[in-house]
Amino acid sequence: MTETLHLDTEIPRPRGDVWAAFADTRSRQQWSVPAGEALVYDNDDFRSGGSAEYRCGAPGQLQFSAIVTYVAVEEQSFAVQTETVWHGDDLLASGLISWFFDDVPAGTSVSIVDQVVSFVGQDMIEGSRNGHRIALEQLGTFLAGPGQISAGASDRDSRPS
């Protein structure tokens, strides 16, 4: 089962600030995980040709693991990566994920295109969609200053988000 997901948001901060929060592993561990879950990078070599490994899931269990290969990274512009996710020895999904960062009058537009293949059905694809939506919203919240409200993410595939 395959699908191409398109999600985006606008964040009222300069592109350099948004990119810094995206590129920094420690920051990414904070904003990219849904509330009530945990994510730990075992390694992250964020550069073209680099790779990363992380575990995520319920705190204390981290039952899912992923391997990432950074295909191409252009600072403050885009990152293209492959990502494969397992639960133990069970292969769940693999995808080609592209993040794009562009200047807009309100700050920075962040877009995600995820060409995902699920080996376990539609729920994994919906989980990817929901995970990206949450990550975009939380990236905006992470970067929002005191008293600021970040914008939500939109799903350009016209599905409820």
Pin down the residues of each PLM region.
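Hydrophobic pocket/interface hotspot
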Residues: 18-22, 28, 52-54, 70, ...
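Hydrophobic/aromatic beta-strand elements that line small-molecule binding cavities or substrate pockets
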Residues: 7-9, 41-42, 66-72, 95-103
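A short, structured loop/turn motif at beta-sheet edges
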Residues: 15-16, 47, 71-78, 100-109
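A conserved amphipathic terminal alpha-helix motif
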Residues: 116-161
